[in-house]
Amino acid sequence: MAFDGFITKSIIEELKPHLIGGKINKVFEPTKNDIVLSIYSNGNNYTLALSSNPETCRIGLTTYSKPNPQVAPNFCMLLRKYLIGSKIIDISTMDLERTVQIKFEAYNELNDLVIRKLFVEIMSRQSNIILTNENNIIIDTLKHVESGTRELLPAHEFEFTAINKESFLKLNSFDEFYNTFNSSDEKTLSKIMPSQL
């Protein structure tokens, strides 16, 4: 199943009541593209799978368990350091973007309350998982990216990859929707939704 903006937003809305307020117990990296978070929330244990696999990128709850490497990769160790014991305080997307933000709070070694964010980009070959501080400064990423158009590296600011389309969620009336539809080169709803909205 392809993860477009509609599906991503729908899944996030389903995850919220189960996971917000939950605490991270364990973190695994079973493959180079996958992160698994074990979460205790509302008296239940949940397993949240985050995948940056270009062909099967996704986010969602799972009961399927993959074998984990005997030695945890570096990014997994970093996530364990910063996230185990943290509480999930929000899960969100921006409109119909395919970037999911999971916000955590935890106490550091000085007993100060700190906020961290885990961004999951569900975008085929550009899929990635990024850990930042409260100000969106990257702590580390599953995949380092250094290109002319975008850099995803530690100490850099994380910037959303926005789709330059008008979100139908921002349209205030049927007339606005009709005008957007009517001004498009596409004349069928199935084509205009992905291309213009």
Question: Could you tell me what each predicted segment is?
Answer:
Residues 43-197:
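Phosphate/anion-contacting hairpin/loop surfaces
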Residues 6-67, 71:
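A structured, charge-rich N-terminal accessory region that forms the first stable segment of a protein
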